[in-house]
Amino acid sequence: MLLGFVGLGAVVETAYLPAIRNLFPDTPRCLGFDIHPEKQPEGVTRCASLGELLSHPLDTLFITTSSLYHLEVLEQALASPASRIVVEKPIVATLPQIEKLKALLAQPGAADRVLALDHWMARLDSVKQSLVAHVSDIVKIEGFLQEPSGYNAEGEPIALNFATGEPDARTLRHPDGVILDIGTHVLAMLRETVRYMDGSDDITLEVVTAKDRLGREIAMGDLTTAEGEAHLQGSISGVPVDIWLNKYAGPAGGQKGLRFYLRDGRIVSHDRRGAEDVLELIKGKEIQRWHIPGTIYEHCLAEHILGAKSLFERDPHQVSRTTRRRVEEVTLLLTLQQQLRGPH
């Protein structure tokens, strides 16, 4: 197996490569290219150019650059022989890019080659355990991504790397706030779960609150400051939804997943705790609990991307449909940004 990576930043080093090593006793050969020559993670053979990387007979190409450059790389990848192209979330970063993306995917033979990835779309254990029979059994859904954070010398909250827990040295700017950057995770998990419960893709959302890293409201016309936390509200398949996003939720963080409130009074909770997912069926003081070990990237790569059971193998038509859903979600979140900040 020959894998290629365009963009060799932290997500490759701390998420993809460890997951690949854990999944395969004989680690696949990995090639990569990055415009920054200092980025050379162990286990990846660097190519001198993107063209050189694309000239190899890659089994799967991963586009893992910053989101603003996904479209540019994807256009070149589609012009290459690469038959399986996986684009990290969000697949694009602006509304004008959405229109260009749709034109690219409309080219003959393109859509079935491109999978828009959000690794949270593999978190379907509430469906696998058959804890909710049908979306009509649900009266309310809550989605959460409340990330642990640290503090700088001034006592201000700072972001932490999601995989290592080390301080994130990046200065986050719009559009890399929580609405687009991590809201994609919650929407992907939410929509895939509801879809398997025979729900529809219909979704509406609005911004209730959005604040920066220091807790100040995002002002209309501010096209620079990233949101540090946000509360989104709406519905999916007719069910009321509240989504809570926070990149600065304190040293312990908070819930990372979904809670389904059922008509019979029970609650289904799907959370990420340490190195495992935890699924709970709550009925008063009685709690049934399931533990799902392994990183989310391991589950996603094993179940959707690589190997004989990948989505490309078991259901090729779902590749383009999955990408369409991820594009719809990004479009919705980018539209919320327009409403929050003004046209831009």
Task: Put a short name on every predicted segment.
Residues M1-G43:
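N-terminal Rossmann-like dinucleotide-binding module
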Residues G9-V11, S66-Y69, I91, M121-R123, ...:
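Short beta->alpha connector loops
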Residues T27, S80-R84, A110-R113:
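A short helix->loop->beta-strand "cap" motif at the edges of active sites that frequently abuts
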Residues E42-V86, P90-L104, S130:
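Beta-loop-alpha module in the N-terminal Rossmann-like domain of NAD(P)-dependent dehydrogenases
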Residues T60, I91-A159:
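A contiguous active-site-proximal alpha/beta segment in oxidoreductase catalytic domains
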Residues T60-I63, T209-K211, A302-H344:
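C-terminal helix-rich "cap/oligomerization" subdomain common to oxidoreductases
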Residues T164-P240, N246-A252, T331:
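Rossmann-like dinucleotide-binding domain that binds NAD(P)(H)
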Residues M220-E229, Q233-H304:
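NAD(P)-dinucleotide binding in Rossmann-like oxidoreductases
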